[in-house]
C-alpha cells in the first residue's frame, strides 16, 4: 500500500462540476492499494498517517505534531495510479487491486480511520469516479508512505527490532577492532612436529546473519 500525504491549508473534491467534499487545515491523503494488501497493511498505514508529525507545536517547533494532535481534518482520495509500473513510457497498473475488491478495502480503510480518529473529521472523494482534486499544499510538504511488503521480515515489528539489534551488535564489534580470538589466530605458533599435516584455513568468528 502506498500513500502520498500532503499538508494542506484546504482541499476539496469535485465530481461532474459539483463539490462533494472539502476540508480546511489538515492533510490530503492519496491512497494506492496493491494486489497483496491485507488488513495488516491497512492498519499499518492508518497508524502512520494519523501519527505522522507534519505540523508545528504551540511554540513554533516544526515536525512536532500530528493531524490527531492538532485535531485537523483529513481528506482521503483513492489513487490506484500510485501502483503504476512503467513499461517503457507507458504506465501499467497490474499491481493495483482490482476495482471490485479495492472498493471494499478502501471503505475498510476509511472505517479504520474513523474508528481511530474523529469520524466527522474524515472526508473522502468518490471511489471510481473521475474527480478534480483541488489541493492547496502548505509549505509545500509532501510525504510518501509505503507499508512493508506482505511476508517480509520488516512487516513484523518484533523481527524488525531483532534485526536492528543484530546490526547494532555488528557495528559495535567492528568499532572495537579485532577480537581476542582473532588476535590469537593471527599470532604465529611454533610448529608441532607431531601434528599431522593438512591445509590450514581461517574461519571467521563472526557469522553472517
From Swiss-Prot:
Expressed in many adult and fetal tissues. Highest levels in testis, ovary, spleen and in adult and fetal brain. Preferentially phosphorylated in cells arrested early in S phase. Phosphorylation in the C-terminus weakens the interaction with CDC45. Residues 142-209 are annotated as: Disordered. Its main location: nucleus. The modification Phosphoserine is found at residues 197, 204-205. One of its GO terms (molecular function) is metal ion binding. Pfam families: Tyr_Deacylase. It is found in: Nucleus; Cytoplasm. One of its GO terms (biological process) is tRNA metabolic process. The keyword Nucleus applies. Residues 159-170, 181-194 have a biased composition (Basic and acidic residues). It catalyses: glycyl-tRNA(Ala) + H2O = tRNA(Ala) + glycine + H(+); a D-aminoacyl-tRNA + H2O = a tRNA + a D-alpha-amino acid + H(+). Its EC number is 3.1.1.96. CDD domains: Dtyr_deacylase (cd00563). GO terms for cellular component: cytoplasm; mitochondrion; nucleus. The keyword Ligase does not apply. A motif (Gly-cisPro motif, important for rejection of L-amino acids) lies at residues 139-140. Keywords: Cytoplasm, DNA replication, DNA-binding, Hydrolase, Magnesium, Metal-binding, Nucleus, Phosphoprotein, RNA-binding, tRNA-binding. Mg(2+) binds at residues 4, 6, 28. Homodimer. Interacts with CDC45 and TOPBP1. A Gly-cisPro motif from one monomer fits into the active site of the other monomer to allow specific chiral rejection of L-amino acids. Possible ATPase involved in DNA replication, may facilitate loading of CDC45 onto pre-replication complexes. An aminoacyl-tRNA editing enzyme that deacylates mischarged D-aminoacyl-tRNAs. Also deacylates mischarged glycyl-tRNA(Ala), protecting cells against glycine mischarging by AlaRS. Acts via tRNA-based rather than protein-based catalysis; rejects L-amino acids rather than detecting D-amino acids in the active site. By recycling D-aminoacyl-tRNA to D-amino acids and free tRNA molecules, this enzyme counteracts the toxicity associated with the formation of D-aminoacyl-tRNA entities in vivo and helps enforce protein L-homochirality. Belongs to the DTD family. This is D-aminoacyl-tRNA deacylase 1. The gene is DTD1.
Amino acid at each position: 500500500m502506498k500513500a502520498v500525504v500532503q499538508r494542506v491549508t484546504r482541499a476539496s473534491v469535485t465530481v461532474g462540476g459539483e463539490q462533494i467534499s472539502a476540508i480546511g487545515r489538515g492533510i490530503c491523503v492519496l491512497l494506492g492499494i496493491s494486489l497483496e494488501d491485507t488488513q495488516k497493511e491497512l492498519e499499518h498505514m492508518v497508524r502512520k498517517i494519523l501519527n505522522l508529525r507534519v505540523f508545528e507545536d504551540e511554540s513554533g517547533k516544526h515536525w512536532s505534531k500530528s493531524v490527531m494532535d492538532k485535531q485537523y481534518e483529513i481528506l482521503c482520495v483513492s489513487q490506484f495510479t500510485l501502483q503504476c509500473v512503467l513499461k517503457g513510457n507507458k504506465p501499467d497498473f497490474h499491481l493495483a487491486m482490482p476495482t471490485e475488491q479495492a472498493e471494499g478495502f478502501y471503505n475498510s480503510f476509511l472505517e479504520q480511520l474513523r474508528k481511530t480518529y474523529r469520524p466527522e473529521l474524515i472526508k473522502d472523494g468518490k471511489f471510481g469516479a473521475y474527480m478534480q482534486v483541488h489541493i492547496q499544499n502548505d509549505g509545500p510538504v509532501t510525504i510518501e508512505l509505503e507499508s512493508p511488503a506482505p511476508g517480509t521480515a520488516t512487516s513484523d515489528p518484533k523481527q524488525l527490532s531483532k534485526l536492528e539489534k543484530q546490526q547494532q551488535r555488528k557495528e559495535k564489534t567492528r568499532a572495537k577492532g579485532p577480537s581476542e580470538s582473532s588476535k590469537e589466530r593471527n599470532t604465529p605458533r611454533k610448529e608441532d612436529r607431531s601434528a599431522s599435516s593438512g591445509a590450514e584455513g581461517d574461519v571467521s568468528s563472526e557469522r553472517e546473519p
